[in-house]
Swiss-Prot record:
Residues 85-92 are cytoplasmic. PANTHER family: TRANSMEMBRANE PROTEIN 256 (PTHR43461:SF1). This is Transmembrane protein 256. It is found in: Membrane. The modification N6-acetyllysine is found at K43. It comes from Mus musculus.
Length: 113
């Protein structure tokens, strides 16, 4: 299991780097369709950072595979739906947000137990 934990730690670090890159893009280069788009982007970025940090803790939990998969997939679905809507104004994939959020909750529970 040490290899699995190390893989999720690496994924968390890469995700954090990606979150920082997106934060820079959102602050300096992005063209948002409206003020709500900027707010949505910032919300996605905050969650992206937070859950990247959570992935760094996966190797320390009792069920690293479950916790890592739930956190990684939840972060992807939740943040991607927000980033996409923020940048495009298209709401067609916003239903992925609650699915991703539910996976994130389960991921945090997997970290705890």
């Amino acid at each position: 299991m040490a290899g699995v934990g190390a893989a999720f730690r690496r994924l968390g670090a890469l995700s954090g780097a990606g979150a920082l890159g997106l934060a820079s893009y959102g602050a300096h280069g992005a063209q948002f369709p409206d003020a709500y788009g900027k707010e949505l982007f910032d919300k996605a970025n905050k969650h992206h950072f937070l859950h990247s940090l959570a992935l760094l803790g996966v190797p320390s939990c009792r069920k690293p595979v479950w916790a890592g998969l739930l956190l990684a997939s939840g972060t992807t679905l939740f943040c991607t739906s927000f980033y996409y809507q923020a940048l495009s104004g298209d709401t067609s994939i916003q239903t992925l947000g609650p699915v991703g959020g539910s996976l994130l909750i389960l991921g945090w529970l997997a970290l705890a137990f």
